From Swiss-Prot:
It comes from Sus scrofa (Pig). GO terms for cellular component: endoplasmic reticulum; endoplasmic reticulum membrane; Golgi apparatus; lipid droplet; mitochondrial inner membrane; mitochondrial outer membrane; mitochondrion. Residues 49-71 are annotated as: Disordered. Interferon-inducible antiviral protein which plays a major role in the cell antiviral state induced by type I and type II interferon. Catalyzes the conversion of cytidine triphosphate (CTP) to 3'-deoxy-3',4'-didehydro-CTP (ddhCTP) via a SAM-dependent radical mechanism. In turn, ddhCTP acts as a chain terminator for the RNA-dependent RNA polymerases from multiple viruses and directly inhibits viral replication. Therefore, inhibits a wide range of DNA and RNA viruses. Residues 56-68 have a biased composition (Basic and acidic residues). Its main location: endoplasmic reticulum. This is S-adenosylmethionine-dependent nucleotide dehydratase RSAD2. CDD domains: Radical_SAM. The gene is RSAD2. The lineage of its organism: Eukaryota, Metazoa, Chordata, Craniata, Vertebrata.
Length: 362
């Protein structure tokens, strides 16, 4: 009997508070719901801002996303020297230094790139055949194909310093040789800065085409369309040479390289409009191997390594270097490359680039 008294008393006491508490809960309920919804909206807004890249720092969406997602260096352009025997007026990688990495250090960097996912390496300059008469380049080409077993090894050259003996020693390890040719008019080549005294740039191009066929190297042509060649019709010449690709670039200005106070070139006189570039492309629309690249496509869609193996970020119209991959590794350095992988794929940056897969009729 006495044990039930406290329980009964407690139940009666609780019953006296049920109605007031219920009233309080019903009045506070909407307030709690409103606060919860407000916090949810605030969190949602922050999430949407992150997805859209609208940060307080005002960073663009690509920069915000790229800082968290690793970039694979599928295709890399290694400008291991800035030295050149030509003086092309629009050149955007000029001879500001004479530095070239020791061979073993260059190989170490290439090994790091391979481990990070590199499939294609393109050697450029400057003029890549100028250093050690092409032997340094040849050893890197052989290393990349034999030891790294890269699917594609290519070179961009003006062609003036290449000898047949180089093909005999290293041709089997090279997939693609791209030769720069901006005009089939020798007077225009002189105006541009590709004149070499008694040497004829066009005749040399034809000789190199023959060597590429003889030594089973895919032949490619690169042309920079500028004020002096924009009216030219190159259709018949290109068809006769029959390259696997004819890369056509719009003349590009880069602060500190070919425009501005610190530049070694003054390329403003070579610049053409987007409309003029489109007219040139339309004139050559029947050339099946034509691959055009406007300034917009070109600026952010290349992974460029300089002579110190630093990635060069060209997003702001100049070349801002990262730290060297030899010092900080590929993953850290590539975050500062400014590389736009979507544009790389959109411009056709990934194609059949191994001569084993090209199935050419040598």
């Amino acid at each position: 009997m006495w044990t039930l008294v406290p329980v009964t008393f407690a139940l009666r006491l609780l019953s006296t508070f049920v109605q007031p508490l219920g009233s309080l809960g019903s009045s506070l309920g909407p307030l709690f719901l409103w606060l919860w919804a407000a916090f949810w909206r605030a969190g949602g807004d922050r999430s949407r801002q992150q997805l859209q890249g609208k940060t307080e720092a005002g960073e663009p969406p690509r920069a915000q996303e790229d800082s968290h997602l690793p970039t694979t260096p599928t295709s890399v352009n290694y400008h291991f020297t800035r030295q050149c025997n030509y003086k092309c007026g629009f050149c955007f990688h000029t001879a500001k230094t004479s530095f070239v990495l020791p061979l073993e250090e260059a190989k170490r960097g290439l090994w790091l790139l391979k481990e990070a996912g590199m499939e294609k390496i393109n050697f450029s300059g400057g003029e890549p055949f100028i250093h050690d008469r092409g032997e340094y380049l040849g050893k890197l080409v052989r290393f990349c194909k034999e030891e790294l077993q890269l699917p594609s090894v290519s070179i961009v050259s003006n062609g003036s310093l290449i000898w047949e003996r180089w093909f005999k020693s290293y041709g089997e390890y090279l997939d693609i040789l791209a030769i720069s040719c901006d005009s089939f008019d020798e007077q225009v080549n002189v105006l541009i800065g590709r004149g070499q005294g008694k040497k004829n740039h066009v005749e040399n191009l034809q000789k190199l085409r023959t060597w590429c066929r003889d030594y089973k190297v895919a032949f490619k042509i690169n042309s920079v369309i500028n004020r002096f060649n924009v009216e030219e019709d190159m259709t018949e010449h290109i068809k006769a040479l029959n390259p696997v690709r004819w890369k056509v670039f719009q003349c590009l200005l880069i602060e500190g390289e070919n425009v501005g106070e610190d530049a070694l070139r003054e390329a403003e006189q070579f610049v053409i409009s987007d409309e003029e570039f489109e007219e040139f492309l339309d004139r050559h629309k029947d050339v099946s191997c034509l691959v055009p690249e406007s300034n917009r496509q070109m600026r952010d869609s290349y992974l460029i390594l300089d002579e110190y193996m630093r990635f060069l970020n060209c997003r702001n119209g100049r070349k801002d270097p990262s730290k060297s991959i030899l010092d900080v590794g590929v993953e850290k350095a590539i975050k500062f490359s400014g590389f736009d992988e979507k544009m790389f794929l959109k411009r056709g940056g990934k194609y059949v680039w191994s001569k084993a897969d090209l199935k050419l009729d040598w």
